[in-house]
């Protein structure tokens, strides 16, 4: 996230904590331009619910050459950080539930978190109706049966991502086919 999304992130966190009071969370926040005040706000919020916030500051060169496309001018380059979770998070974390910082959680997320991943890359919400009519699979050149998905909620198998170099695959695809990327990180994933 960046400073502009701290307020939204706080709402997401409160909805997560309030609707999952029996769970203990470590929230991993990836941010480049958060002030100490911003961090203190989110850390205090997590602490109020007996949870923990950890912060990761990616290298600025990680997104060198990346741009925000289409009509998504409300997004920042920070949107691409989810592609690099396997590189940014500590090696001892083998799975992560990625949540966009502008969503509201209305119930128990435990069933989603406990979804077996086995050898799968992860779990995502398919049939993104906002992009359905665009036939993204044709433009991105992947089989239609693989389904385009919304990248706002992702349960990610970090072991698989690390073993299969998913972060590097995203970079390689972006640099090889930049003209195909319209929906930013979502197209890469």
Where are these regions (language model features)?
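Catalytic metal- and UDP-sugar-binding loop of GT-A-like glycosyltransferases, i.e.
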Residues: 99
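Short internal beta-strands
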Residues: 25-33, 123-126
């Amino acid at each position: 996230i960046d400073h502009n999304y701290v307020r939204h992130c706080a709402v997401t966190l409160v909805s997560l904590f309030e609707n999952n009071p029996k769970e203990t969370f470590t929230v991993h926040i990836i941010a480049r331009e958060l002030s100490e005040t911003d961090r203190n706000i989110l850390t205090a919020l997590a602490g109020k619910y007996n949870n923990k916030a950890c912060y990761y500051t990616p290298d600025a060169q990680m997104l060198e050459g990346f741009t925000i496309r289409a009509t998504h001018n409300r997004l920042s380059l920070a949107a691409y950080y989810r592609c690099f979770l396997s590189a940014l998070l500590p090696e001892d974390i083998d799975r992560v539930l990625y949540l966009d910082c502008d969503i509201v959680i209305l119930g128990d997320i435990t069933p989603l978190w406990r979804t077996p991943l086995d050898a799968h890359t992860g779990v995502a919400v398919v049939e993104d109706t906002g992009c359905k009519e665009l036939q993204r699979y044709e433009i991105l050149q992947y089989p239609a049966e693989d389904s385009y998905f919304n990248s706002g909620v992702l349960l990610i198998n970090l072991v698989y991502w690390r073993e299969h170099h998913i972060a590097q695959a995203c970079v390689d695809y972006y640099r090889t086919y930049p003209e195909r990327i319209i929906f930013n990180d979502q197209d890469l994933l």
